[in-house]
């Protein structure tokens, strides 16, 4: 049984055992584009990836399944070298603890995503970045574009273009990096990990 066959079985829920860790060769490969129309397996895989993110953000399910919380997952992280990513970025509660009007600022499965334009301005998360495929903490600014325009296909073969900034832009760039065999810590300056370049946006 292939990896994708196992992952897309009806009863299977993606968990941390399915996620490969740094050092695995698939994480350093350039993933293949998917062809349209998608296979049923490719559609189901995208749905399972999104389901994993929802479970990881649900305190009850995360504890039950022993999941690390995540806002993005790329197919290579589950040992499927295809250009598929899922992103699920929740909106925060307001100052009084009320739930947001919209639960998510970004919720999508992207097939063959491609950055087609980006800002000159760079950005990095103040607290650095983490990754479900990296079990250690790696400190330093992960320097990325502050704003990006991304083209992608949905599961129905419809083409979309989205413009992202801030945390959403960071998340999508992190996941697209996985499709190109790039890990987040590749973008940290080893000599000066917390250097702030002129004009760089530091996101809290």
UniProtKB/Swiss-Prot annotation:
Its cofactor is Fe(2+). GO terms for biological process: co-translational protein modification; translation. The keyword Cytoplasm does not apply. Its EC number is 3.5.1.88. InterPro entries: Peptide_deformylase, Peptide_deformylase_sf. The active site is at 175. Fe cation binds at residues 131, 174, 178. It comes from the Bacteria. GO terms for molecular function: metal ion binding; peptide deformylase activity. Binds 1 Fe(2+) ion. It holds the Pfam family Pep_deformylase. It catalyses: N-terminal N-formyl-L-methionyl-[peptide] + H2O = N-terminal L-methionyl-[peptide] + formate. Keywords: Hydrolase, Iron, Metal-binding, Protein biosynthesis. It is an enzyme of class 3 (hydrolase). The keyword Coiled coil does not apply. Removes the formyl group from the N-terminal Met of newly synthesized proteins. Requires at least a dipeptide for an efficient rate of reaction. N-terminal L-methionine is a prerequisite for activity but the enzyme has broad specificity at other positions. Belongs to the polypeptide deformylase family. This is Peptide deformylase. The gene is def.
């Amino acid at each position: 049984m292939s990896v994708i066959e196992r992952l897309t079985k009806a009863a299977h829920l993606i968990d941390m055992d399915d996620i490969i860790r740094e050092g695995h060769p698939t994480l350093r490969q350039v993933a293949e584009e998917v062809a349209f129309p998608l296979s049923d397996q490719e559609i189901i895989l995208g749905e399972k990836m999104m389901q994993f993110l929802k479970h990881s953000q649900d305190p009850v399910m995360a504890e039950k399944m022993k999941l690390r919380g995540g806002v993005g997952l790329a197919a290579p992280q589950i040992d499927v070298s295809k250009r598929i990513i899922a992103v699920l970025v929740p909106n925060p509660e307001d100052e009084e603890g009320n739930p947001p009007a919209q639960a998510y600022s970004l919720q999508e499965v992207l097939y063959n995503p491609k950055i087609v334009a980006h800002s000159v301005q760079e950005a990095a998360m103040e607290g650095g970045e983490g990754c479900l495929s990296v079990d250690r903490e790696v400190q330093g600014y992960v320097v990325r574009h502050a704003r990006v325009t991304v083209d992608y296909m949905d599961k129905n073969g419809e083409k979309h273009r989205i413009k992202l900034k801030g945390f959403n832009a960071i998340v999508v760039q992190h996941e697209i990096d996985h499709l190109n065999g790039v890990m987040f810590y590749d973008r940290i300056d080893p000599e000066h990990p917390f250097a702030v370049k002129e004009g760089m946006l530091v996101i809290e």
